[in-house]
């Protein structure tokens, strides 16, 4: 796993393609100033991961791209889930955000969506969301 800027990412993914690697996985490392209690940056269509997906699909169109769905890289407390004032994880509210994150990644052109969070029921909820929500055409 390597931390890359977009230009470096394009170079690395192009090199990987030339070496016969046909799928890459993207994990975000965003600036701390973008982290919030609700992790809303995870579904920003102009955010780091959607932008990286669109650029990679333009530069290395045949490369399969897998993305991570999780709130912890985007939340200021680093938790996988939203946390209430008593410290309890809000499972259902978190899943609603994870579905938006997955849909944002799919709309950007991700080929595979890989949830790594720990919310109960998130895989089925994300799958249903992706099956029944028509993604807009890829840029």
What residue spans do the PLM features occupy?
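Active-site mouth loops of central-metabolism enzymes
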Residues: 3-7, 82-96
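Alpha-helix-loop-beta-strand connector modules within alpha/beta enzyme cores
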Residues: 39-67, 123-134
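Non-catalytic positions within long, well-ordered alpha-helices that form the structural scaffold/packing
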Residues: 14-17, 106
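Catalytic beta/alpha-barrel core
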Residues: 94, 111-118
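Glycine-rich, proline-tolerant flexible connector loops at the mouths of alpha/beta enzymes
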Residues: 23-46, 116, 120-123
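Conserved, mostly hydrophobic/aromatic
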Residues: 9, 68, 105, 126
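Hydrophobic faces of well-ordered beta-strands that scaffold small-molecule active sites
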Residues: 24-26, 65-67, 113, 138
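Conserved small/polar residues in nucleotide/adenosyl-binding loops
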Residues: 1-5, 132-139
């Amino acid at each position: 796993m390597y931390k890359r800027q977009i230009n470096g990412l394009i170079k690395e993914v192009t090199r990987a393609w030339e070496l016969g690697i046909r799928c890459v996985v993207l994990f975000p490392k965003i600036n701390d100033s973008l982290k919030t209690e609700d992790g809303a940056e995870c579904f920003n269509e102009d955010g780091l991961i959607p932008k990286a997906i669109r650029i990679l699909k333009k530069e290395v169109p045949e490369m399969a791209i897998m993305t991570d769905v999780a709130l912890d890289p985007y939340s200021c407390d680093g938790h996988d889930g939203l946390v209430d004032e008593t410290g309890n994880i809000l499972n259902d509210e978190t899943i609603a955000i994870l579905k938006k994150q997955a849909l944002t990644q799919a709309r950007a052109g991700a080929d595979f969506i890989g949830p790594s969070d720990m919310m109960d029921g998130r895989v089925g909820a994300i799958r249903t969301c992706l099956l029944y929500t028509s993604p807009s055409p890829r840029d």
